[in-house]
Amino acid sequence: MNLLEQYSQDPQFARLLAQEELILEVTETLCALLEKEQVSRAELARRLGKSKGFVSQLLNGGRNLTLRTLADVLSVLGYKLKLQPEKTDGQGGRGRMVT
C-alpha cells in the first residue's frame, strides 16, 4: 500500500482531498471557459466589477470561491452550472461539474 492509499484510509484526509480536487476541477473549468470564449482575466474582472487581483486569486485557487461568485463568473461568460454528483468509494474523490 502506497502513502496516498494509507492517507486515503483517514476520513479527514479523504475529505480534504475531495475539497482540493473540487477546487482544482472548478478553477480548471473556469480557465478553460475563459480560453474558449477568448476572455482575458482583465476582461473577466471588468465584467464582474472586480479587481484583476480578485480574479487572479479566484482562478489560482487562493480565494474561497462561493457558489454566488461561481454563478456570477459563469453568468458573465454566458454559462450556467449543472452539478452531477458521482458516488465515490467512500475514500474521497469528486463528482463532475458539467457546464
PLM features per residue range, with description:
Residues 68-84:
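DNA major-groove recognition helix of helix-turn-helix/homeodomain DNA-binding modules
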